[in-house]
């Protein structure tokens, strides 16, 4: 399928969750003394990001509070992703439980696109995983008052 359509129309799709606060991994102290720090013990609502990657383009990032489910993925595809795709694109998804294969294939075919699913437990085959790792790293070193949406906007072409 990839040989027929070419790699320029391959679009990798994934989602990632972001905790509200990020603890520091390192600190400074006098030699031989422990570093003490505080970290919130209560849980706050996490944010989720759904996005796609085509080549070097970061497509249709959607940031929202809560966790990703089937309804979020379908809504995101219909309202954001399809507007940014080239005709006859191939969407590549992982095997998350909420990626209902038959539903996704039907929605994609209605818009003239195709779906492929990665083998289970193969994040190394999905290049957008590197984007999520980079975003989390940038967030970790950003000033605490920096909104996650601002980090994503700087990283790609994020629009609310």
Please name every model-derived segment.
Residues 1-160:
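Short functional hotspots at interaction and active-site rims
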């Amino acid at each position: 399928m990839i040989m027929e359509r070419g790699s320029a129309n391959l679009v990798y799709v994934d989602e990632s969750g972001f905790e509200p606060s990020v603890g520091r991994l390192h600190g400074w102290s006098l030699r031989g003394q422990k570093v003490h720090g505080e970290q919130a013990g209560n849980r706050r609502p996490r944010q989720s990001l759904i996005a796609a990657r085509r080549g070097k383009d970061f497509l249709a990032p959607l940031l929202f509070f809560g966790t990703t489910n089937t309804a979020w993925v379908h809504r995101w595809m219909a309202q954001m992703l399809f507007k940014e795709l080239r005709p006859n694109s191939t969407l590549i998804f992982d095997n998350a439980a909420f990626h209902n294969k038959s539903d996704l294939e039907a929605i994609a075919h209605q818009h003239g696109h195709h779906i492929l699913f990665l083998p289970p437990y193969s994040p190394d085959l999905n290049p957008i995983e590197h984007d999520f790792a980079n975003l989390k790293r940038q967030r970790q070193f950003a000033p605490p008052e920096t909104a996650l949406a601002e980090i994503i906007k700087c990283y790609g072409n994020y629009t609310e």
